[in-house]
Amino acid sequence: MTWQVLVHGPLTRLDERVSAAVVDSVPRRLSELASDLGNLTVALPVLAAAMAYAVWHGRRTDALYAGLAMAAVPLLVIPLKEWTARPGPLEPWAEGYYPSGHTATAMVAYVGAAYLVSHRLVPAAAVLTAVTGTGLVLRGYHWPLDVLASLCLGFLILGAGGIAAVSSRCTRRSSG
């Protein structure tokens, strides 16, 4: 996807046609409300509460990994935005829309929180993430590829944190 964005390839042109067809296809108030789920002021308190819950239940390492995963979001998203310098759907003069930081924030915060509290909440976290990304596209804040790239990035961030958490649990069990 990144390569297609950089060279303005056929996938990017399809992305632009899809965006033009769906922007403002739902009431703006609804798409704005959905996209706001990716704001730090909404997503970060959810993750912080789940981290506090995990610490309270003796899972400090898991809470640490969730916090580090969230810290990784801007460390990865901002350089990609700078590198690709992709203009926005409604603001062709502005740059830095690829990948979507709101989508990555929502995914890492909500899925991370779900893993910390109860794995049964992961489907709800996935729905919140999907609603966020859909709202961003329908409102015209992001292209669909911006959102898809952030989902891929979120899987990488969460996967790296998950591997670290699993290995720390295995180490604790074998040493105990």
Label every model-predicted segment.
Residues 1, 9, 13, 71-79, ...:
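Transmembrane alpha-helix boundary/anchor motif
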Residues 45-47, 53-120:
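Membrane-interface loops
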Residues 1-2, 48-49, 127:
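Hydrophobic alpha-helical topogenic segments used for membrane insertion/localization
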Residues 1-42, 81-89:
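N-terminal transmembrane-helix/juxtamembrane module of multi-pass inner/ER membrane proteins
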Residues 3, 19, 35, 77-85, ...:
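Membrane-water interface at transmembrane helix exits
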Residues 26-29, 72-75, 148, 152:
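Membrane helix-loop-helix hairpins that form the core translocation module of multi-pass transporters
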